[in-house]
């Protein structure tokens, strides 16, 4: 289908005439679902921003005002809150699919995707703080203070982010502005991610990404993606029946700078990294391990000599990695006591061991199977 308009031609190339492998499975739908959820979050978040006041004395009460006084404000708040969890569910599925099918061989796609992941984690953390509840306030204190480990400039950076010597209303305004602006930067990188992906074509379940036996994306796959409707219906129903099951009870208590919660726990999608941070008693080493738990995957783009002899081994290692990540997430929400303090370092070691084992094996695969 030939279209003269350049913009429509670009969209047509993305959604209609895109050459797609005949062997794609439903796991290739995670990316399109992520795009829809991102737009959904931007729309609901913009509505909430109309009524939110980034002030330390009014932030918590304006959230309650949105819930009880604004027409359908509770719907937007609940959908935005649970939409973040839906986004991270598909984001982790998308990443694990990429590891499973070795998508890191598409270097630009992989690097841009990981950058999106890091920015989304920052975005979610700042949105978590905006509620200005007891748990989110102390999470902001703990996480931002980790930047003090940066040599020379660390304490200055922390003071700059806090806009003073502690987390205050100025910090809240800083986070609100960034939380509002960052999604637009994420959208730009997502566009670059799509351009990089569609310039080469994605990998397939046969571990190849050449122009072999391909079909147009529409109507073959556009029709198959209709199961997204079921996902959205489930999301709406579960959000209305269990609106705050993925949250913490401390999020219904207004922030009190004079009294910290008994047990500080971040949102579930940060728990694996939080468990790794707590597993190391040294602050500097803990922060380095926290960063490396994500940054390590940038090095997977160095893999360029893949051999098909290792597909079964790769599947096994990825499954083990998923299991270790899940256990770390469970340990992250447990209290700091035995046996959890013993298990956290153990599974942190397994997490990094599996990641670097995959990296080493696939980087040296051609040498191993000459």
UniProtKB/Swiss-Prot annotation:
GO terms for molecular function: electron transfer activity; metal ion binding; oxidoreductase activity. GO terms for cellular component: membrane; mitochondrial inner membrane; respiratory chain complex III. The keyword Ubl conjugation does not apply. GO terms for biological process: mitochondrial electron transport, ubiquinol to cytochrome c; proton transmembrane transport. Its main location: mitochondrion. Heme b b562 binds at residues 80, 179. The chain crosses the membrane at residues 30-50, 74-96, 109-129, 175-195, 221-240, 284-304, 316-336, 342-362. Binds 2 heme b groups non-covalently. The main subunits of complex b-c1 are: cytochrome b, cytochrome c1 and the Rieske protein. Heme 1 (or BL or b562) is low-potential and absorbs at about 562 nm, and heme 2 (or BH or b566) is high-potential and absorbs at about 566 nm. Belongs to the cytochrome b family. PANTHER family: CYTOCHROME B (PTHR19271:SF16). This is Cytochrome b. It comes from Caenorhabditis elegans. The gene is ctb-1.
